[in-house]
A protein has these predicted regions:
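Cysteine-rich micro-motifs
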Residues: 165-176
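Short helix-coil boundary/hinge micro-motifs
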Residues: 1-151, 155-162
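Residues that scaffold the ATP/ADP-binding catalytic core of kinase and kinase-like folds
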Residues: 160, 177-178
């Protein structure tokens, strides 16, 4: 998320308050991170969740199968994008959106740390992570098109990527967000 300083009004005049802006690209990067991650066991899952301390702490063996299923289905979306099969990518993403629905809510203790969660209170680690990843990739597809994501063309690689380059012309993910 990005921190913005926005002036707010109080009885004594404007005050500066921190506000959070939702960064949908960060959610799309979750999809990339998941697809490219090894998921051999709980330790691997915790590495994937390294930037989200509460998720890392609450991750359990029961989450691994859910993450693996989503990993496979998300890879298919990236492969469809790489193959210029836009309608199929949209269909696959819509199916994932149904499997991992969002229920956005505002969280925080006061105006200085309001932020969004993509699932309801008490949702599992898998529900929170996957709803965000799928939503982020769907927003990315709508914003940039499937030509801006795919699978690395280097046969030794196979990683998926989001193309953040200025000219959208590299067949491998070097220099791209992965």
């Amino acid at each position: 998320m990005t921190t913005l300083r926005i002036p707010a009004m109080s009885p004594s005049g404007p005050v500066s308050v921190y506000r959070w802006r939702v960064n949908f690209d960060a959610y799309a990067h979750r999809a990339v991170d998941l697809v490219n991650a090894p998921l051999g066991g709980l330790d691997d899952l915790k590495v994937l969740l390294r930037d989200e301390s509460w998720m890392r702490e609450e991750a359990a063996e029961r989450d691994i199968a859910t993450f693996r299923r989503a990993q496979k289905k998300l890879r298919e979306v990236f492969e469809l994008g790489a193959g210029h099969r836009d309608m199929d990518a949209v269909t696959a993403l819509n199916a994932l959106l149904e499997l991992h629905p969002m229920q956005p809510r505002i969280s925080g203790h006061d105006a200085a740390d309001w932020h969004m969660h993509v699932t309801s209170r008490g949702a599992s680690v898998a529900a929170e992570y996957l709803a965000g990843a799928v939503w982020g990739l769907a927003v990315w597809l709508c914003e940039y098109g499937s030509a801006r994501f795919g699978v690395c063309a280097d046969e030794r690689c196979g990683n998926v990527y989001l193309d953040t380059s200025s000219n959208c012309c590299r067949p491998t993910w070097t220099g791209r967000a992965s």
